[in-house]
Amino acid sequence: MKTLTRNISRTAITVALVILAFIAISRAWVFYTESPWTRDARFSADIVAIAPDVAGLITAVNVRDNQLVKKDQVLFTIDQPRYQKALEESEADVAYYQALTTEKRREAGRRNKLGIQAMSREEIDQSNNLLQTVLHQLAKAEATRDLAKLDLERTVIRAPSDGWVTNLNVYTGEFITRGSTAVALVKQHSFYVLAYMEETKLEGVRPGYRAEITPLGSNRVLKGTVDSIAAGVTNSSATRDSKGMATVDSNLEWVRLAQRVPVRIRLDDEQGNLWPAGTTATVVITGEKDRNASNDSLFRKIAHRLREFG
């Protein structure tokens, strides 16, 4: 009898443990596969690629790599003497054509006043046409001067906003061409998070929902709000051939990989460049309200920690 009771007890305990394990595995499966979260998230920021609008020798570099700069602070300067000479030349042309215009206007006015009684109509028309030609040349000279002035102003490269200088790869004495990127500026107060959510989890993601962000290698949890969800992603399995026909890649019907959709998350409190743009994080969407960790069960607390560091 004791042996039977012992066997029944062992069987009951085994069945109970199996049931508990099944429940735990089921809850873990739902928790990890259906709840809206991802480890594929990146800190991002607005980045300006700074390139000069003029070409020439770099005569001064006023900043260092990774320096925090203010808006309109001078970053570097390009060959000002050359552009100063070009401006002086264009100003001389303007002064010449202004004087010539005054002379031709006076001459045309005198001939028009005398009229055909003193000279032929052809001479009067010729004088008026010459005045119009000189006025046209003056306008061109003024436009050239304005462009020279603009070029001179743009020899001084300034920061378009507050931010951090990064990847500075220009040095005094180098020749830089127009439009070539010299440095990147990471705008201050522009940091956000891009979470690449699987399409199967988008049902639980809406603009305005709250989010928890855990940077990789950190136990600090940041808070944020879903700002927007991308309206589309590239279809990598469908392209066009040289004749414009659709080319669709073959796939296995029983294996379908979920597409990842970018979700932009606005941070409640920006941490400057503590987590640089491009670094990774885990993102959990908690719904309309923040998660109250004190109300979580032990299982959920453990699952959250494993998910954050997984």
Swiss-Prot record:
<dbReference type="InterPro" id="IPR022871">
    <property type="entry name" value="PHBA_efflux_pump_AaeA"/>
</dbReference>
<dbReference type="InterPro" id="IPR050393">
    <property type="entry name" value="MFP_Efflux_Pump"/>
</dbReference>
<comment type="function">
    <text>Forms an efflux pump with AaeB.</text>
</comment>
<keyword id="KW-0472">Membrane</keyword>
<feature type="transmembrane region" description="Helical">
    <location>
        <begin position="12"/>
        <end position="32"/>
    </location>
</feature>
<dbReference type="InterPro" id="IPR043602">
    <property type="entry name" value="CusB-like_dom_1"/>
</dbReference>
<dbReference type="InterPro" id="IPR032317">
    <property type="entry name" value="CusB_D23"/>
</dbReference>
<keyword id="KW-0997">Cell inner membrane</keyword>
<dbReference type="Pfam" id="PF16576">
    <property type="entry name" value="HlyD_D23"/>
</dbReference>
<comment type="similarity">
    <text>Belongs to the membrane fusion protein (MFP) (TC 8.A.1) family.</text>
</comment>
<keyword id="KW-1003">Cell membrane</keyword>
<keyword id="KW-1133">Transmembrane helix</keyword>
<protein>
    <recommendedName>
        <fullName>p-hydroxybenzoic acid efflux pump subunit AaeA</fullName>
    </recommendedName>
</protein>
<keyword id="KW-0812">Transmembrane</keyword>
<keyword id="KW-0813">Transport</keyword>
<dbReference type="InterPro" id="IPR006143">
    <property type="entry name" value="RND_pump_MFP"/>
</dbReference>
<dbReference type="GO" id="GO:0022857">
    <property type="term" value="F:transmembrane transporter activity"/>
</dbReference>
<dbReference type="GO" id="GO:0005886">
    <property type="term" value="C:plasma membrane"/>
</dbReference>
<dbReference type="Pfam" id="PF00529">
    <property type="entry name" value="CusB_dom_1"/>
</dbReference>
